[in-house]
């Protein structure tokens, strides 16, 4: 299977060269294809899968997709990548257009993700505190500010009685952007 995957990678690099320099690396037991460190496609078991996006939805409706899946802890996980069938390989213009849609959507998502402010980026916040806030429904800075430190602390306290007043002060400092 590995040699089939490499053949498909090289064929993809050749067909999609107009998108830029396509690099590959191992990921989830498959290979990710990237342009400028942005993943837009995967190769698994000798098949190319493109990242599904809004622009490719019409194609996916007309051609019911086979989704990329992999095993994680004994469970099947379906990724948002659809298989490129032989008819699409025969229509290189359409393949390049759909690949460009996938790449553009991935680049757009990457830029919005990089501009979005995470809770852990605030003063006094750690990855652990961000995680437990997420467990009580507070997933971003906006929600933290709207609810306020006291309400967030009460939600945390309701779920875990070991949450101390120190966390309340940390939340206050994070909202006010001051270290405690």
Annotated model-derived regions:
Residues 1-94, 108, 159:
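Structure-specific DNA junction-binding interface
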Residues 1-3, 25, 31, 108-180:
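C-terminal extensions
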Residues 7, 11, 97-101, 170:
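Long, highly charged amphipathic alpha-helices
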Residues 13-16, 99, 153:
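A generic alpha-helix structural signal
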Residues 82-99, 137-139, 172-179:
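Short flexible/disordered coil segments
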Residues 91-114:
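Short, structured interface segments
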């Amino acid at each position: 299977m590995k040699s089939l995957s490499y053949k498909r990678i090289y064929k993809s690099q050749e067909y999609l060269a107009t998108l830029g320099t396509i690099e590959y690396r191992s990921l989830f037991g498959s290979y990710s294809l990237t342009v400028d460190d942005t993943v837009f496609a995967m190769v698994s078991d000798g098949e190319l899968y493109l990242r599904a996006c809004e622009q490719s939805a019409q194609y996916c409706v007309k051609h019911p997709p086979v989704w990329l899946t992999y095993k994680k802890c004994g469970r099947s996980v379906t990724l948002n990548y659809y298989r490129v069938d032989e008819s699409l390989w025969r229509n290189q213009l359409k393949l390049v257009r759909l690949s460009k849609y996938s790449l553009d959507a991935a680049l757009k998502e990457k830029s919005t993700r990089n501009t979005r402010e995470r809770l852990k980026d605030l003063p006094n916040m750690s990855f652990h505190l961000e995680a437990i806030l997420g467990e009580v429904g507070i997933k971003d800075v906006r929600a933290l500010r709207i609810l306020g430190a006291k309400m967030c602390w009460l939600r945390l306290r309701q779920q875990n009685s070991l949450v101390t007043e120190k966390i309340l002060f940390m939340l206050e400092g994070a909202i006010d952007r001051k270290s405690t």
